[in-house]
């Protein structure tokens, strides 16, 4: 009798995989094991919950029971997997174990919290569960410090500002979105955040946090300090690799997989935020969707390589939204920036005048799909 496929995780990657498997095979045994409730929610919504007045439970789209019934699944929520015996094809928790034919790691990534004194006072918003734990504090907070000016930090800064809170955003870099694009491109959004009232502390460093009678005292470099009611870490994600490491799989930044999503063990695969595909960690929805389609085929006996096209990344800052694609972080590109009242188109070209990247904003985002077609594969 077939032991079927065991998936560790229940987030977007795991669910996309389940849907793609069931399109092709209605009966192969599918078992999902995860530490959370396994209820479905849309993770990008976490960047907008405060301005929209949503509670954690409002985010639930489908309960675990409904999910299991719809797709004929064996679910084990609130279950921590402790070990994988790759040789015996067994997954273990404290009180249970599961035999598998094929195993998929979809363990996601955890929010990185800067290792400063008082780091335990920092909140993270990387899951519905994390939001549920801190939603009262965030709703009641009047003064909010966001640590990190990347994609999530910028989205959160705008959202909290739209909710009427006093927002300070701190980052080591000289501009927001510094790992994604040069300052001359991000300056439009940076200016908009400042106009809205976000206090930007760039080229600045958080040195420690301390609880006070009236809030949290954040100590910064250059003998500065600020008192706030809540501090949110938005300093990036770290792929969850501990389980894979204990199983003896090859690890770099994430769980290393090839173009077939296969790890260094023939019967173990990785998908989503935890996976490093041919040296790249791609924690965005579109590559995860495409990876899930390919992996479903391969788990069912095909041999299909993943081929990723040029893809859009969306920065969901409603007052000034951005779409970007290509190698926007490349240092050697020349940027041709066309700015109008209704939006911006920034083109990054190489020495041969070949388009390598672009960023578009506001009403000019409709030009993204035409530009996308001209990017090299």
Curated annotation (Swiss-Prot):
SUPFAM superfamilies tied to this protein: FAD/NAD(P)-binding domain
Gene Ontology MF terms in the entry: oxidoreductase activity, acting on iron-sulfur proteins as donors, NAD or NADP as acceptor
GO cellular component labels: cytoplasm
The enzyme's E.C. designation: 1.18.1.-
UniProt xrefs under Pfam families: Pyr_redox_2, Rbx_binding
Catalytic activity: 2 reduced [nitric oxide reductase rubredoxin domain] + NAD(+) + H(+) = 2 oxidized [nitric oxide reductase rubredoxin domain] + NADH
Cofactor(s) listed in the protein's UniProt record: FAD
Main location, first listed in the record: cytoplasm
Function, in words: One of at least two accessory proteins for anaerobic nitric oxide (NO) reductase. Reduces the rubredoxin moiety of NO reductase.
NCBIfam families linked: PRK04965.1
Family of this protein: Belongs to the FAD-dependent oxidoreductase family.
Descriptive protein name: Nitric oxide reductase FlRd-NAD(+) reductase
Originating organism: Shigella sonnei (strain Ss046)
């Amino acid at each position: 009798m077939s032991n079927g496929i065991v998936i560790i995780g229940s987030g977007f990657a795991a669910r996309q995989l389940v849907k793609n498997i069931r399109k092709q095979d209605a009966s192969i045994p599918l078992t999902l094991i995860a530490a959370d409730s396994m209820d479905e929610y849309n993770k990008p919504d976490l960047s907008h919950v405060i301005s929209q007045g949503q509670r954690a439970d409002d985010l639930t789209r489908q309960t675990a029971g409904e999910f299991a019934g719809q797709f004929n699944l064996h679910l084990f929520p609130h279950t921590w997997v402790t070990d994988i015996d790759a040789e015996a094809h067994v997954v273990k928790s404290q009180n249970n174990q599961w035999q598998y034919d094929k195993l998929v790691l979809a363990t996601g990534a955890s929010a990185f919290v800067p290792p400063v004194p008082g780091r335990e006072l920092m909140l993270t918003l990387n899951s519905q569960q994390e939001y549920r734990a801190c939603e009262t504090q965030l709703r009641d907070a009047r003064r909010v410090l966001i640590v990190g000016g990347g994609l999530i930090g910028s989205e959160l800064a705008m959202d909290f500002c739209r909710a009427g809170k006093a927002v300070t955003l701190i980052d080591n870099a000289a501009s927001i979105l510094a790992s994604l694009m040069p300052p001359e491109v991000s300056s439009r959004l940076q200016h908009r955040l400042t106009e809205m009232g976000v206090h930007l502390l760039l080229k600045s460093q958080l040195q420690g946090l301390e609880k006070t009678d009236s809030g949290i005292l954040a100590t910064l470099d250059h003998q500065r300090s600020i008192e706030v009611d809540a501090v949110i870490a938005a300093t990036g994600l770290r792929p969850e690799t501990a389980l894979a490491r204990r199983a003896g799989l090859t690890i770099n930044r994430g769980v290393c997989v090839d173009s077939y999503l296969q790890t260094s063990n023939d019967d173990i695969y990785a998908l989503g935020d935890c996976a490093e595909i041919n040296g790249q960690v791609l924690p965005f929805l579109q590559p995860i969707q495409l990876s899930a389609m390919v992996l479903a085929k391969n788990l069912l006996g095909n041999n299909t390589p993943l081929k990723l096209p040029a893809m859009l990344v969306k920065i969901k800052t409603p007052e000034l939204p951005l779409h970007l694609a290509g190698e926007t972080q490349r240092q050697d590109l020349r940027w041709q920036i066309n700015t109008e009242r209704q939006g911006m188109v920034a083109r990054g070209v190489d020495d041969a005048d070949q388009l390598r990247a672009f960023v578009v904003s506001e009403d000019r985002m409709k030009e993204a799909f035409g530009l996308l077609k001209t990017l090299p594969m």
